[in-house]
Amino acid sequence: MSTVDLTYWDLAASTSLVLIAVAISFFQGLGLERSLIWAACRTVIQLLSVGYVLRWIFQVEHPVAVLALVLLMVTVAGRAAVQRSDYTFPRAKLLAFLVLLTTGLSISYIVTKGIIGLERWYEPRYLIPLLGMILGNTLTGISLGLHSLLHALKRERDVVEMELSLGASAREAVAEPMRRAVKQAMVPIINSMMVVGLVSLPGMMTGQILAGNDPLMAVKYQILVMFMLAGTTALTGIGMSYVTYRKLFNNNHQLLSELITKQN
């Protein structure tokens, strides 16, 4: 089965679907017309730009080009993860970047080299899509976990400091907020795994089917992706909670609550 190629005229015709949303916003007085049009324009520009960049990277297959795109993706994901939280602390974006980079590349290596069995684990046709799915899902987990932990340290500051005064170490005093943070980070992927294939067909699976691949092969890859996302989300949740705790306590086991600030 061959894939039906969409022309630019087909894409232009698809804008009528966005215009339906614009019309509803106008007649219902929602005031979202400009936002919808701007969002549609950004969608076209961003995706076409990514498409041309990926086509070039797939053609040259040079490790430096792949690394540059990986660093860009992780940087954007790290910033987005921290910005989605109501609270932040100094160097939070840098720490999120490091956590996402180490866990993302580690899991990608395990999947591409150890499970799929690629000769070159950084094969861009595999690494870039897989890493993109990892970052897209784990940044949500980091954001939820970070918000939970920082909010708890602000709200439960007296409880934490009381435990410290009674002889608990910083790690012991923050153990429960960290557990809640990791649990919060895991909720979205667990919910997705519960309903996958029943309520919705994931993007990767749908894309492979539309591309003409065998549905069972698409399902196998999707199962691999879901398990990959579960493991990565757990690792990034624990990793971000740990580096946050290390940043907010000094060597004397004192909570530096003044470092936690509310974002605009």
Kindly give the residue locations of the regions a language model identified.
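C-terminal ends of transmembrane helices
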Residues: 22-34, 77-88
